[in-house]
């Protein structure tokens, strides 16, 4: 059944429906756990540490990263609200399942949890957290050039993927900062991989067949064509693989 054909449930069940439609906890949580754990382990391996990193680094990296990705979803709900109302009224916010005010409250609760974790694990982590928040805030406001950036899809893509290395930097920092270390040599390649991973996912999810295209909904197949978009996506995938190979060589992986 299409979401627009569903009635909106009442009470707490609304949030279960919201996560199912807009931010599946199990699916996203599994990916984010792999994302954050690899960041912690990569940092430790770069510094040639023996044994597994402390559990607190894994926990802090996972919870904070999970909240970051939830905040990204909520930020999208805000900045896309007018377009969703017009072109995709069946989505959760336009159809009244949850309100933007409620989502904003969830966003703030998440931020307080992130802050609390940083202060608990190692207070200087707050510095990186603030940088990531600031970038997320700029993204939410379309860098204060909404019409300009929306008319330039490639610029829109790379500026919005800039958040990925920042989230990954924070995740790695939960391992190296509490130990009094500096940014590990070679970490830049891991951040490059995270950037292009984000690009691959973002471009891939907006490649549609002709009959799946919808009026008013931007896709990369509309921008680059039915043949061009998959080819460009494959190019990004290749760059990601090369970057990952370089990063892997730094820890003698593979």
Roles of regions detected by a PLM:
Residues 1-77, 147-150, 160-163:
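Topogenic membrane-insertion module of multi-pass membrane proteins
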Residues 87-129, 224-251:
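Multi-pass membrane catalytic core of lipid/isoprenoid biosynthesis enzymes
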Residues 66-75, 134-145, 165-173, 191-211:
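Transmembrane alpha-helical segments that form the membrane-embedded catalytic/substrate-channel core
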Residues 39-61, 113-127, 166-192, 243-254:
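Helix-coil boundary and interhelical linker segments in multi-pass alpha-helical membrane proteins
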């Amino acid at each position: 059944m299409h979401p627009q054909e569903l009635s909106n449930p009442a009470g707490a069940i609304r949030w279960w429906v919201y996560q199912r439609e807009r931010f599946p906890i199990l699916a996203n949580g599994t990916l984010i756990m792999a994302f954050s754990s690899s960041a912690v382990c990569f940092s430790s391996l770069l510094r040639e540490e023996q044994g597994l990193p402390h559990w607190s680094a894994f926990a802090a990296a996972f919870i904070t990263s999970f909240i970051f990705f939830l905040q990204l979803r909520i930020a999208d709900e805000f900045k896309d609200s007018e377009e969703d109302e017009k072109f995709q009224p069946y989505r959760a916010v336009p159809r009244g399942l949850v309100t933007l005010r409620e989502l904003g409250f969830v966003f703030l609760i998440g931020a307080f949890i992130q802050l609390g974790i940083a202060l608990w694990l190692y207070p200087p982590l707050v510095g990186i957290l603030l940088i990531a928040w600031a970038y997320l805030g700029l993204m939410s406001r379309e860098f204060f050039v909404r019409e300009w950036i929306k008319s330039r899809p490639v610029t829109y893509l790379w500026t919005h993927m800039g958040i990925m290395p920042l989230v990954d930097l924070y995740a790695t920092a939960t391992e190296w900062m509490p130990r009094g270390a500096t940014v590990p040599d070679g970490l830049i390649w891991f951040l490059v991989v995270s950037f292009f991973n984000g690009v691959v996912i973002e471009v891939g999810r907006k490649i549609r067949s002709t009959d799946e295209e919808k009026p008013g909904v931007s896709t990369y197949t509309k921008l680059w064509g039915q043949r061009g978009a998959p080819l460009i996506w494959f190019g990004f995938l290749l760059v990601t693989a090369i970057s990952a190979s370089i990063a892997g060589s730094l820890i003698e992986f593979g």
